[in-house]
Amino acid sequence: MVKKALIVILILLPFVQLALLPLVNRIEPIMFGLPFFHFWLLLWIIVTPLCSFGIYQMQKKDGGLE
C-alpha cells in the first residue's frame, strides 16, 4: 500500500509543480545566476525524469513490467 501511495505521489509531483507556476513567477531571488522562475523550470526538468525513474524501479521490483 505504501508503494502504491509513493507511486501516485511521484506521478502527481510534476503536474502539481505546473499548478505552482503562477506562485513562482518572480525575478527575485536570483539562484545560481538565474531568475527564480528559470531556476524552478530547470529544477523540474531534472526532477521529472527522476520521478519517472523511481516509478520504473518500483514497478520493476514488483514485476509489473512483464
Curated annotation (Swiss-Prot):
Q: List the disulfide bonds.
A: none
Q: Which InterPro entries match?
A: DUF3311 (IPR021741)
- The answer to whether UniProt assigns keyword Cell membrane to this entry is yes
Q: What is its main location?
A: membrane
How does the record say this protein sits in the membrane? Answer: Multi-pass membrane protein
Task: Write down the species.
Answer: Bacillus subtilis (strain 168)
Compartment(s): Cell membrane
Q: Which protein is depicted?
A: Uncharacterized membrane protein YoyD
The cross-references to Pfam families, in alphabetical order and at most eight, read:
DUF3311
